[in-house]
Amino acid sequence: TLFKHNLVEIRPEKKEAIFINLDTQQELVQPYDMIHVTPPMGPPDFIKNSPLADSAGWVDVNKSTLQHNKYQNVFGLGDASSLPTSKTGAAIRKQAPVLVKNLLSLMKGEALTASYDGYTSCPLVTGYDSLILAEFDYDLNPQETFPFDQSKERYSMFLLKKYVLPPLYWHGMLRGRA
């Protein structure tokens, strides 16, 4: 992992990744065996340039209630929010019920009692048929779903990622069923 570096080129024939240091603008050539690239993430301009945004441009929400820190009738979650956790489908799956419960409570004039703990999940592919399913909260405490040690590589977790999670996402989560 290279922090404060931007990937600008990949030379697959040489197995080299070219990065620019964001502080010094110096080029770094990094050899690799396998490379996993995450595109740069940032808030959309219509949020970044609005009064809803925090200093970094994300929707400024309370990390537990998901309610905006200035406008009480605004809530935020997922990729546009300032939540200090990974922007993953697993995270938003746990954020959505908290947001709904707290929004309904606000509409009824009740206290916001639902709380998001920062849960997120990161399936780490470790081989052609193995995976570690890392699940954790804001404090990086394990939040394992299954009754076994998920810090170990498992074929079953690979099968879950390959065959179960895609339909769960497309036919469950996106339709509010999971």
Whereabouts are the PLM-identified features?
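A conserved FAD-binding loop/helix module that cradles the flavin
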Residues: 77-126, 133-135
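FAD-site-proximal beta/loop scaffold in flavoenzymes
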Residues: 31-94, 104-105
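Rossmann-like dinucleotide-binding cores of NAD(P)H-dependent redox enzymes
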Residues: 1-4, 110-112
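A structured beta-alpha segment of the ubiquitous adenosine-cofactor-binding alpha/beta core
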Residues: 20-28
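A conserved short coil-to-beta-strand element within the FAD-binding core of flavoproteins
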Residues: 3-16
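Glycine-rich beta-alpha junction loops
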Residues: 7, 34-42, 120, 126-130
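FAD-binding beta-loop-beta segment adjacent to the flavin cofactor pocket
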Residues: 57-75, 126-146
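C-terminal auxiliary extensions adjacent to catalytic cores
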Residues: 133-178
